[in-house]
Regions:
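Asp-based, Mg2+/Mn2+-dependent phosphohydrolase catalytic module
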Residues: 2-9, 14-32, 44-69, 76-301, ...
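N-terminal phosphate-binding loop and flanking beta/alpha elements of the actin-like ATPase fold
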Residues: 36
Length: 306
């Protein structure tokens, strides 16, 4: 059975600047098995080359840029495929700017077709410019729905979703969110896996991630197998909160090493049944814009007062 793998990075392969135990052996086992694999991240700031270098520094060298697919690349693919000839005003940097440039999507600070929001430094001046562009008819597009992203074991930073939400509130216009769990991210990632096989079809595609709202939800809605690892942002007791459930629940990617080496999948393919007592948890806030229930109509803007 030919299986392809889509793999989240933060919380699955590394945390902060350290590899998760077993991650290096897992990647080596993947390469040894001959299975096609792509690292799939909502972070729009790095380029695939940046991510390859980072993994090399952490102890997983030799991966080419074709093994990485970011929400920046997904955004550029979406615009190039659905609106060729469009222009953009960008709030973002690094990987997002590079991806748009490589797709020959020009920047336009006067009358852009889209305001595109990614990760990176944000100024009030740039937000005001984006607001003006949207009021002038530009559509609002976010590379991903993440309101916040972890930067350390104790700290976070605002994400693209939070910036897009600011502009939604100020303009009354809805953003369209790409990246995980949007089906277009999984559609393009699936295409990359097939290209790696030389066009041969895959009997099975597995998404391995640590976040229920993006990795697992997106995989299930795309018809993929969804493997949740508990080495990142999700705790086992929180699974009772979700209507959708992963195909398997693993401690970390280390649990898959022997399967990859032997080529024999475990007979235990279903998630365990969690019969956990109700747990009171402090809700910090929705991590993703897709967590917030919304209507498919423009958000009303409060009248201005003078």
């Amino acid at each position: 059975m030919k299986t392809g793998y889509l793999i989240d990075m933060d919380g699955v392969i590394y945390r902060e600047n350290q590899l998760i135990p077993g991650a290096r052996d897992f990647v080596e086992a993947l390469i040894g098995s001959g299975a096609p694999f792509v690292f799939l991240t909502n972070n729009s700031a790095p380029t695939p080359e940046d991510l390859s270098v980072r993994l090399g520094h952490l102890g997983i060298p030799g991966l080419s840029s074709r093994h990485f697919y970011t929400s920046a690349l997904n955004t550029a693919d979406f615009l190039g495929e659905t609106h060729p000839g469009c222009t953009v005003f960008v709030i973002g940097e690094g990987g997002l700017l590079t991806a748009l440039h490589e797709r020959r999507i020009p920047n336009d600070g006067l009358h852009p077709s889209y305001v595109v929001v990614g990760e990176g430094a944000v100024s009030m001046e740039k937000l005001a410019k984006a607001h003006s562009c949207i009021e002038g008819g530009a559509r609002l597009l976010a590379t991903n729905p993440d309101n916040w992203c972890p930067v350390s074991s104790e700290g976070t930073r605002p994400g693209a979703g939070a910036t897009a939400a600011f502009l939604e509130a100020s303009t009354g216009r809805r953003a369209y969110y790409l990246g995980k769990p949007n089906g277009y991210m999984f559609h393009r990632a699936r295409r990359k896996l097939v290209e790696m096989t030389g066009g041969s079809s895959l009997e099975e595609i597995v998404m391995i991630g640590d976040t229920m709202e993006t990795d697992i939800r997106g995989a299930i809605e795309a018809g993929l197998h969804a493997y949740l690892v508990l080495s990142g942002s999700t705790q086992a007791e929180s699974l009772i909160d979700y209507v959708y459930q992963p195909t398997r629940v693993l401690g970390s990617v280390a649990d898959l090493i022997e399967e990859l080496r032997s080529g024999k999948p475990s007979s235990r393919l279903d998630s365990p049944v969690f019969s956990l007592p109700g747990v009171k948890r402090r809700r910090v806030g929705n991590r993703h814009q897709t967590d917030i229930q919304v209507h498919n109509k423009p958000r009303p803007r409060a009248p201005m007062t003078r």
